[in-house]
Amino acid sequence: MALQALHSSGVGLRRILAHFPEDLSLAFAYGSAVYRQAGPSAHQENPMLDLVFTVDDPVAWHAMNLKKNWSHYSLLKLLGPRIISSVQNNYGAGVYFNPLIMCDGKLIKYGVISTGTLIEDLLNWNNLYIAGRLQKPVKIVSMNESTVLRAALDKNLKSAVTTACLMLPESFSEEDLFIEIAGLSYSGDFRMVIGEEKAKVLNIVKPNVVHFRELYESILQKDPQMVYKMHQGQLEIDKSPEGQFTQLMTLPRTLQQHINHIMDPPGRNRDVEETLLQVAQDPDCGDVVRLAVSSIVRPSSIRQSTKGLFTAGVKKSVIYSSRKLNKMWKGWVRKTS
């Protein structure tokens, strides 16, 4: 199963987890502190560790965390756990981040998301925010036995493969596929222009092809529309209109709706299936899918970054943004020198 490739037994990560309330349905670490990246991140001595905690009851979890880690929160802590949870659930991409926290001698940023919100994002790509993080190799530190969550995690990976294949030609390499997958959650993200280094996707994939393969190998082997030449690192996908229609029909619901919105002329109000049938026969099918992905990511990334001003506080937001801009500047200097 693809999810087995996500598990980690890292003692250091579990030591950090011990500083937080235990009621987690899922906890995972991601980013350059977990998996080596090329570019500016490769030269950071102590990169910040990124973590996400998934909780069944955000109000109860934040209440416990405020008692244990009061200093982690911005001034929103004065309004109590219910307001914090309301901000978490109702604004941005449904996740509440506390950045620039020293924990067990390590600089970390952690986000909190409700289990229900995460499952919705994994299945439907409402925001493609945390779901996008989980399309790339991560280290799962803790996960409960929820079959619903595990099925949603697996479905998210399958959706990432299908979406990427629709944007690729009939024949392509493993690396081509992994680059498309890694780029999904950055497609349309304004931070790829402001702050984040533009070559970020390549920097993520190239040093981690083995980890991407571990994550997706079983899905690629079982896909009935795909020929996976594993030893050659090459793949072929059915690009017939019938094949593409089958692929489009399995896409996450929100992505299908965005495709329908892009293609449906004013006044027609066609149903989604009719639109997908048209797109399947369109030579620009891949471009339509790419545009639809961007139309999900762009607004959610803007909303989440704006929300960060309130959840992190102005001072931390300025420091965090400066770190991001510094990474972009170092990458630019390295390219031009």
Curated annotation (Swiss-Prot):
Domain of life: Eukaryota
Keywords: Lipid biosynthesis, Lipid metabolism, Magnesium, Membrane, Mitochondrion, Mitochondrion inner membrane, Nucleotidyltransferase, Phospholipid biosynthesis, Phospholipid metabolism, Transferase
EC number: 2.7.7.41
Pathway: Phospholipid metabolism; CDP-diacylglycerol biosynthesis; CDP-diacylglycerol from sn-glycerol 3-phosphate: step 3/3
GO biological process terms, semicolon-separated: cardiolipin biosynthetic process; CDP-diacylglycerol biosynthetic process
Tissue-specificity statement: Brain and liver.
Catalysis: reaction(s): a 1,2-diacyl-sn-glycero-3-phosphate + CTP + H(+) = a CDP-1,2-diacyl-sn-glycerol + diphosphate
Residues that span the membrane, as ranges: none
Residue ranges of coiled coil: none
Nucleus keyword on record: no
Bilayer topology: Peripheral membrane protein
Intracellular or extracellular location(s): Mitochondrion inner membrane
One Pfam family hit: Tam41_Mmp37
Cofactor needs: Mg(2+)
Cellular component, GO, one term: mitochondrial inner membrane
Similarity field: Belongs to the TAM41 family.
Biological role stated in the UniProt entry: Catalyzes the conversion of phosphatidic acid (PA) to CDP-diacylglycerol (CDP-DAG), an essential intermediate in the synthesis of phosphatidylglycerol, cardiolipin and phosphatidylinositol.
Protein name in UniProt: Phosphatidate cytidylyltransferase, mitochondrial
